[in-house]
């Protein structure tokens, strides 16, 4: 065994784990609410009714008046549950803001980047925890699994998918931030132009590769 191949493992502190638990609990509620909203829309569509276009946060307010009479016994409890989940998500949002103000003020600096909000900045700070353990900033991209796999045969070097190592929640949040930066509402910036140059190369999944590249730059 060559000891030089080994690397030390740094465990997260109990306080960091507790703060991450708040973010992961919120993420579970957000995904649950999305599934409930999609289910309600699907049930109504089967009877020829469409709910108005709106955000998931406002769905419980705008949907009730459009529920078909035949579906009210089935959808009314779900709409009440969506409302309760929305209230709980807002409570988690306030808790996240309190954690940032009390323990992680550096997140406010991270939020200066367009598309990066409280949840993404705090998740990044908690997952990285100690930036000094990385020798260079490029190592962070590999740490959260946003660098391509390698498979060199000598004759060819195929382009493979990213490794998807590390924390999946942080990786998803960074990709969402990158999607906003590259989207129609994202203002002009170095990150946006960087992603547009990659997308302009064309090829299969060019837009998807550009979002991943911008997310890696964010990290």
Task: Give names to the regions the model predicted.
Residues 1-11, 17, 58-67, 154-165, ...:
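Short alpha-helix plus adjacent loop in nuclease-associated cores
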Residues 3-7, 36-37, 89, 129-133, ...:
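Short helix-capping/linker segments at secondary-structure and domain boundaries
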Residues 9-12, 42-45, 53-58, 153-156, ...:
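Short coil/turn segments at secondary-structure boundaries
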Residues 14, 18-109, 190:
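Glycine-rich, often acidic, oxyanion-interacting loops/wings at catalytic, nucleic-acid
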Residues 32, 36-39, 120, 136, ...:
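Residue-level detector of well-ordered alpha-helical segments, enriched
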Residues 109-112, 118-207:
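Phosphate-backbone recognition surface of nucleic-acid-processing proteins
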Residues 202-219:
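Charged substrate- and nucleic-acid-binding regions of tRNA-handling and nucleotidyl-transfer enzymes
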């Amino acid at each position: 065994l060559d000891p030089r191949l080994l690397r030390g493992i740094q465990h997260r502190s109990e306080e960091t784990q507790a703060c991450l638990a708040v973010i992961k609990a919120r993420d579970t509620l957000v995904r649950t609410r999305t599934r409930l909203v999609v289910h309600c829309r699907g049930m109504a569509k089967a009877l020829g009714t469409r709910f108005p276009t709106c955000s998931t946060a406002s769905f419980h307010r705008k949907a009730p008046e459009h529920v078909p009479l035949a579906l009210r016994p089935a959808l009314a409890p779900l709409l009440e549950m969506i409302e309760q989940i929305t209230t709980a998500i807002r409570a988690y949002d306030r808790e996240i803001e309190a954690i940032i103000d009390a323990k992680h003020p550096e997140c406010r600096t991270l939020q200066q980047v367009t598309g990066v909000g409280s949840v993404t900045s705090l998740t990044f700070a908690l997952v990285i925890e100690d930036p000094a353990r990385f020798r260079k900033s490029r190592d962070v991209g590999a740490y959260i699994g946003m660098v391509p796999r390698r498979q060199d045969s000598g004759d060819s070097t195929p382009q493979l998918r990213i490794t998807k190592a590390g924390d999946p929640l942080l990786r998803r949040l960074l990709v969402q931030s990158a999607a906003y930066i590259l989207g129609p509402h994202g203002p002009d910036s170095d990150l946006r132009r960087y992603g547009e140059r990659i997308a302009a190369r064309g090829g299969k999944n060019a837009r998807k590769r550009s979002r991943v590249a911008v997310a890696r730059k964010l990290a």
